[in-house]
């Protein structure tokens, strides 16, 4: 975990990892680490390379040094002075359509300066190298509902939301939420896609009916105007694959801030609840956390907020505290609707441009279907 803020000098290289085939990408990874990070990595003869399963925007690999080139360069003694490994993130093809890479890097550096998360070690043309969170595992969707992890995630997310994030290139950045600004941009991109001869995808997108999705965005915007939610520095993509957990000291960190930025608190928490489904939204109704699980998360979040702000607004367990949780529950579940539209439209765009082996259009279809299901459920229960 980052204990020393951002690196004094961020190492950068014009080196580009070839992505024309999985083998060429995999084989190029040791060289990118040697080239970008320099000594002592450039004296490492071999690395153990492992692909990490997580998100579906990029490809992630862990590289652990195995042996030095020559004993006089340090041998085993120097090898022990190296970190156990580094993470290499290779950006997905055409992801610049969806992600502002400059802001992505600024997010990473700004959070690193706050000693939040892992360090950014270096950049190359189509990716970056990050600190490896030692002895950690990547959580699975089924882990998110485990009580001890629910509490830890809630507390860490609260800490992130309370950070005073300043991006040095912009000075004091205007706290403008990204939700609807991004949705407008993405749905315009989705509408402009030429599917060519791919009639299957073309017909499936026509069935989704992006015109109706636009109408739902307007409906949601009006609903959320009536739903107070503070603007915080949000992760915006807190799926299980972006949470690393170390059981030895019960510590966890969030990674991958490329969708991060100022946004509504309710969206960030609601989006995390949606991620209990992983990438299979056919079972969304079964795995979306029930009220009891949500209230456990929200209680841990609210208690951490009171602790960090030294607030005596309401005592945990008091009627005032429970009223606060009920309001937060409504806020989060309303904003969760935005998560479905956000990632639903994203899936349509990725279905056109991404080379990652994943059915993005199916994912987009399922997220938009989950929006309609959730909207109906909220209306039925008097929450919308």
Task: Label each residue range with its predicted role.
Residues 241-280:
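Catalytic activation segment of kinase domains across protein kinase-like and atypical kinase folds
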Residues 50-213, 219, 223-230, 248-250:
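ATP-binding pocket architecture of kinase catalytic cores
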Residues 37-40, 157, 161-168, 194, ...:
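A general structural signal marking secondary-structure boundaries and capping sites
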Residues 233-235, 240:
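Catalytic-loop of the protein kinase fold
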């Amino acid at each position: 975990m980052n204990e020393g803020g951002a690196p004094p000098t961020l190492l950068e290289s014009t080196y580009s990892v070839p992505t024309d085939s999985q083998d060429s990408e995999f084989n190029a990874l040791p060289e990118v680490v040697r080239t970008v990070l320099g000594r002592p990595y450039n004296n490492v003869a071999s690395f153990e390379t492992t692909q990490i399963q997580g998100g579906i925007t990029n490809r992630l690999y862990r590289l652990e040094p195995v042996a030095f080139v020559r004993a006089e360069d340090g041998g085993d003694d120097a090898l022990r002075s190296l970190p156990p490994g580094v993470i290499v993130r290779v950006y997905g093809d055409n992801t610049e359509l969806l992600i502002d890479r400059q802001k992505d890097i600024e997010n990473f550096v700004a959070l690193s300066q706050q000693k939040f998360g892992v360090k950014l070690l270096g950049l190359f043309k189509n990716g970056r190298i990050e600190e490896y969170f030692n002895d950690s595992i990547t959580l699975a969707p089924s882990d998110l509902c485990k009580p001890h992890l629910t509490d830890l995630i809630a507390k860490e997310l609260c800490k992130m939301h309370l950070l005073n994030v300043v991006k040095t290139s912009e000075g004091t950045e205007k706290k403008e939420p990204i939700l609807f600004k991004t949705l407008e941009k993405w749905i315009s991109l989705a509408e402009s896609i030429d599917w060519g001869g791919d009639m299957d995808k073309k017909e499936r997108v026509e069935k989704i009916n992006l015109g109706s999705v636009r109408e739902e965005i307007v409906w949601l915007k009006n609903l959320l105007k009536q739903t107070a939610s503070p603007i915080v520095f949000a992760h915006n993509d807190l799926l299980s694959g972006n949470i690393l957990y170390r059981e030895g000291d019960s510590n966890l960190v969030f990674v991958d801030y490329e969708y991060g930025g100022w946004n509504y608190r309710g969206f960030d928490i609601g989006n995390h609840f949606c991620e209990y489904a992983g990438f299979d939204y056919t079972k969304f109704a079964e795995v979306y956390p029930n009220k009891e699980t949500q209230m456990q998360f929200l209680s841990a979040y609210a208690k951490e907020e009171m602790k960090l702000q030294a607030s005596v607004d309401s005592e945990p367990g008091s009627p005032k505290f429970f009223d606060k949780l009920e309001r937060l529950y409504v806020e989060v579940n309303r904003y969760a609707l935005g998560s479905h539209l956000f990632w639903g439209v994203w899936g349509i765009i990725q279905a056109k441009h991404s080379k990652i082996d994943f059915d993005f259009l199916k994912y987009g279809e399922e997220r938009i279907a989950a929006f309609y299901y959730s909207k109906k459920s909220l209306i039925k229960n008097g929450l919308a």
